[in-house]
Amino acid sequence: MSEYLIIGTGPAGISAAEAIRKLDPGGRITLVTEEKEGYYSRPGLAYLLTGEIPQEQLYPFSRDDFQRLQLKLVFARAVQILPAQHQVVLHDGGRIGYDRVLIATGAQAIPAMLPGAQYSGVIKMDTLAEARQII
């Protein structure tokens, strides 16, 4: 049985997990994310802020979907890949083994380098937690 490790739970990570499950129904698939909310639509955050959608609609892939596809979700930050050992080191010192690993961490906004950007109340919005600071 193959062990698949996907770092990141954005669209690329979720799509990869779905594709792997189709190709290898018995494989073990683990997704690692530091995003406490799991997978949600980051583009949808703008619509959440404007009130066009409720928070529940940010989740196109539910916890039931994770269970249905037998995906293990680990809430941690991957800090190092050890290719020779086929392991990923987590921020807490834990390790996860793999046969195949995919890095699908996506993009992050770069804070603006404008006068006043360092003040409290100026928030870059990459995550649901940051959107909540604005709401």
Region spans (language model):
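Beta1-alpha1 glycine-rich phosphate/pyrophosphate-binding loop at the start
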Residues: 2-72
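FAD-binding core/adjacent interface of flavoenzyme oxidoreductases
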Residues: 1-5, 64-135
